[in-house]
Amino acid sequence: MAITLVNPSGLPEIDVYRQVSIATGSKLVFIAGQVAWDAEGITVGEGDLAAQVEQCYLNIGTALAEVGGSFDDVAKLTVYVVDWTPDKMPLLLEGMSRAAAKLGITPVPPATLLGVAALDVPDHLVEIEATAVLD
């Protein structure tokens, strides 16, 4: 594993991610923003933020597996949520938890959450980018 995740003392400990990732590998993997499309390009969970978050994470898992990686190799996530408000956090966490259970992982690398006005198509409520480092 080329990534070590750390919560430094002096920074708040966040349940859903770590504050710092230390990358020691040499192969960088940049995964395009994943939306809630299945393998056929059909939107999963129309109108359901939790279902869409879950599908985004599953898509990232598929992309990582294709290049010989896993969520253990993820150094950074960027999450874009349409019309973000803090009351959407439980849905975001529910989707993450469901994906983690299916993938057998805990996706806790450093993450940035950004509220956006819109994504590529109106049905998409969330998009997630990942950067990974492989040995």
What are these regions (language model features)?
Residues 1-58, 62-75, 82-135:
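N-terminal presequence-like segments and the immediate start of the first folded domain
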